[in-house]
């Protein structure tokens, strides 16, 4: 899955009703690839811009995509990844918790074909 596909997936998971009153500016840096993204939640919508950074983000996260995917999937926690040295958080970690809390979790165990 490419970064674009991953971020588009996150945009789909964002619960627009819960996010309606939120305004978040998050910078995401992938230290293993050097890629940078400006992530924004505003008006119930998640947007991202590649090769960009917010001038005044609420929080900057530095972690590989697989680490972020694991945190968002609930397979690991951000504190565990920071403790292990696989992630770094600068700024308001509460903004990151808010963003993660705005994501819906989809049930992937459903019948595709039923009688």
Language-model features: locations:
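Acidic, aliphatic-rich amphipathic alpha-helical segments
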Residues: 1-47, 93-115
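C-terminal interaction segments
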Residues: 52-115
């Amino acid at each position: 899955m490419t970064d674009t596909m991953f971020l588009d997936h996150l945009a789909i998971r964002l619960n627009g009703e819960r996010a309606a009153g939120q305004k978040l500016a998050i910078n995401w840096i992938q230290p293993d690839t050097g890629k940078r993204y400006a992530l924004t939640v505003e008006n119930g919508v998640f947007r991202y811009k590649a090769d960009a950074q917010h001038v005044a983000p609420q929080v900057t996260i530095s972690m590989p995509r697989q680490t972020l995917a694991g945190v968002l999937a609930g397979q690991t926690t951000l504190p565990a990844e920071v403790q292990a040295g696989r992630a770094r958080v600068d700024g308001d970690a509460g903004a990151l918790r808010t963003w993660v809390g705005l994501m819906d979790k989809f049930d992937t165990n459903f019948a595709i074909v039923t009688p």
